[in-house]
Amino acid sequence: MGEDTDTRKINHSFLRDHSYVTEADIISTVEFNHTGELLATGDKGGRVVIFQREPESKNAPHSQGEYDVYSTFQSHEPEFDYLKSLEIEEKINKIKWLPQQNAAHSLLSTNDKTIKLWKITERDKRPEGYNLKDEEGKLKDLSTVTSLQVPVLKPMDLMVEVSPRRIFANGHTYHINSISVNSDCETYMSADDLRINLWHLAITDRSFNIVDIKPANMEDLTEVITASEFHPHHCNLFVYSSSKGSLRLCDMRAAALCDKHSKLFEEPEDPSNRSFFSEIISSVSDVKFSHSGRYMLTRDYLTVKVWDLNMEARPIETYQVHDYLRSKLCSLYENDCIFDKFECAWNGSDSVIMTGAYNNFFRMFDRNTKRDVTLEASRESSKPRAVLKPRRVCVGGKRRRDDISVDSLDFTKKILHTAWHPAENIIAIAATNNLYIFQDKVNSDMH
């Protein structure tokens, strides 16, 4: 499918670039909450930064998509496993928001080994006028208390407090690659290379192992778990992907240990395309259920695929993300780029999908019109409120003035982490150590 430069359906403008500096500031995950009012990022330094959407102003109607820093906190610290003599990085692998139950917000964050539940609350009033305590909280001399007064709440500057509520540790031998909150709002699962555990949000010292693909002899190991997610509506269903390119849909009602899947989604390999790199590039790096729950979106190295839950034999749609790299696989293997794990995302109506690429490019595919576009998230190409120009990669021969050659792509600039607002056409793109937020100029055009 060739790229279409007509972007009336996919037309985003740049809102803001939140810029960082050091290695520790490289963004490792991006996640909107269920309303889209909050956006959380995690970085390699173990920090979580939460952005809040600005309320729309009559004086500045363009500010409705603006996100400003709401709170920043240190989620994880570097640790050392003395039993295995291994350092445990503080890098945040995933963040997942819990559905909001009250005025407070809650999120889960995880590094390679430990998952933490955080509560985010606001305070804009403080109590004053205690009878037995002074303003600093110290007990008064009772002889000075001559009258009884009713304490009152006085307004104060807004204060955002983040507090750790639970720490879920010692559940994984291998590195955690994904966490997913169940639709029952009481449980969540965490997956590492070989096992998936089910946790209750209120219980930290016990989890149930629901998938275990570790062979008796590790020499017989042929695949690992790469990602997992709960179904958005059916709390008994979940899917996990593997390094062999397969998806397994499991039903927790069938058995306590879901080693026997309910459905296996796998595309037969085309023998004509078989090469040394076939298995590496077929490894699924991300899997996402559609909001409707009818479809699954997967990302492998060169493509994004849409699967229908009712059809296991092959995907119903396949989109080429950067097929021009097929001839470059040898050099991408040598510089380890072939092992990069790109994420993918649905828009709110499941009609457009998005994923990242190299050179700070990201791709969007409209499932209805079959249009696709390549856009760039970079300071050079993005000025606040400017409309993004579609980019085009040229493989050889004649090229237009704005085209970029495959040989001049920068493989150190990669967009691995993306997120889409659950209801509106606002997207968040993590480009190494910069966060870009884009908003559709013509709202509802893609819906």
From Swiss-Prot:
Looking up Gene3D superfamilies in the UniProt record yields:
YVTN repeat-like/Quinoprotein amine dehydrogenase (2.130.10.10)
Q: Which domain of life is it from?
A: Eukaryota
- List the GO molecular function terms: protein phosphatase regulator activity
Query: Would you tell me the Gene Ontology cellular component terms?
Result: cytosol; protein phosphatase type 2A complex
Keyword Acyltransferase attached: no
Similarity comment text for this entry = Belongs to the phosphatase 2A regulatory subunit B family.
The protein's name:
Serine/threonine-protein phosphatase 2A 55 kDa regulatory subunit B gamma isoform
Q: How does it assemble?
A: PP2A consists of a common heterodimeric core enzyme, composed of a 36 kDa catalytic subunit (subunit C) and a 65 kDa constant regulatory subunit (PR65 or subunit A), that associates with a variety of regulatory subunits. Proteins that associate with the core dimer include three families of regulatory subunits B (the R2/B/PR55/B55, R3/B''/PR72/PR130/PR59 and R5/B'/B56 families), the 48 kDa variable regulatory subunit, viral proteins, and cell signaling molecules. Interacts with IER5.
Repeat region (WD), residues: 22-61, 87-128, 171-209, 220-260, 279-317, 334-375, 410-446
